[in-house]
Amino acid sequence: MSDQEKISHTVIGRVVSDKMDKTITVLIERKVAHSLYKKYVRRFTKLHAHDENNECRMGDIVAIAGTRPLSKTKAWKLVDILERAR
């Protein structure tokens, strides 16, 4: 691969944990239509992402991208911090 890694899939979420070294937990929210009632309900997914410089804090809004598996549970990496927590 060249100097730039290929960025596959990018999602935006909120950091809910930064206690691990070089790893953050990101909460992804999506809205799905209920099959029977057709009302939109919120569904959540927690993903572990690689934060090389430990720069994220809880509450930050971040963009993460899929990458090769880095550990048993970590296959995402931090792309950008979109908004800092207040």
Swiss-Prot record:
<dbReference type="InterPro" id="IPR019984">
    <property type="entry name" value="Ribosomal_uS17_bact/chlr"/>
</dbReference>
<keyword id="KW-0699">rRNA-binding</keyword>
<dbReference type="GO" id="GO:0022627">
    <property type="term" value="C:cytosolic small ribosomal subunit"/>
</dbReference>
<dbReference type="GO" id="GO:0006412">
    <property type="term" value="P:translation"/>
</dbReference>
<keyword id="KW-0687">Ribonucleoprotein</keyword>
<keyword id="KW-0689">Ribosomal protein</keyword>
<dbReference type="GO" id="GO:0003735">
    <property type="term" value="F:structural constituent of ribosome"/>
</dbReference>
<dbReference type="InterPro" id="IPR000266">
    <property type="entry name" value="Ribosomal_uS17"/>
</dbReference>
<dbReference type="Pfam" id="PF00366">
    <property type="entry name" value="Ribosomal_S17"/>
</dbReference>
<dbReference type="InterPro" id="IPR012340">
    <property type="entry name" value="NA-bd_OB-fold"/>
</dbReference>
<comment type="similarity">
    <text>Belongs to the universal ribosomal protein uS17 family.</text>
</comment>
<dbReference type="GO" id="GO:0019843">
    <property type="term" value="F:rRNA binding"/>
</dbReference>
<comment type="subunit">
    <text>Part of the 30S ribosomal subunit.</text>
</comment>
<comment type="function">
    <text>One of the primary rRNA binding proteins, it binds specifically to the 5'-end of 16S ribosomal RNA.</text>
</comment>
<keyword id="KW-0694">RNA-binding</keyword>
<protein>
    <recommendedName>
        <fullName>Small ribosomal subunit protein uS17</fullName>
    </recommendedName>
</protein>
